[in-house]
Amino acid sequence: DEAAERAAALVELLSPFEADEGKAPAGRTPGLPGMGSLLLPPWTVTRYGTDGVEMRGSFSRFHVGGNSAVHGGVLPLLFDHMFGMISHAAGRPISRTAFLHVDYRRITPIDVPLIVRGRVTNTEGRKAFVCAELFDSDETLLAEGNGLMVRLLPGQP
């Protein structure tokens, strides 16, 4: 198949430029949608501070689970990404998600502007309890999530 051959040739052409983890732009470029990661939803950070984080964006046909609604598994990815940013914005060291819970309140549509806002709600030693809400442009609550981020121990992968 010609498309597959071209894709393979492109991968080979770019292979000398592969960057190590921590040096690649993916997930490290806040000015790009999805922070430069192909995995993350292509949203843009609009507020980033110790009191919380806000992102704006939309989902497309690539995120559909059926009937023009966002696939339910996409929202935990959005919230997990948000929880990591919330923890970092609050000045906490690198942490890992220990728990993530999502409540789906309404169908999340594609191709409409959406807003997600989140914050740290409590801290206990290595633990940061976080929450976030997903809204449409009318501020209708579509989903909400809460989670637990745990600071990594020295040398922990």
Where are these regions (language model features)?
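Short, basic and Ser/Thr-rich N-terminal targeting/leader segments
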Residues: 38-41, 98, 128
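Short coil/turn motifs at beta-sheet boundaries
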Residues: 48-50, 95, 111, 125
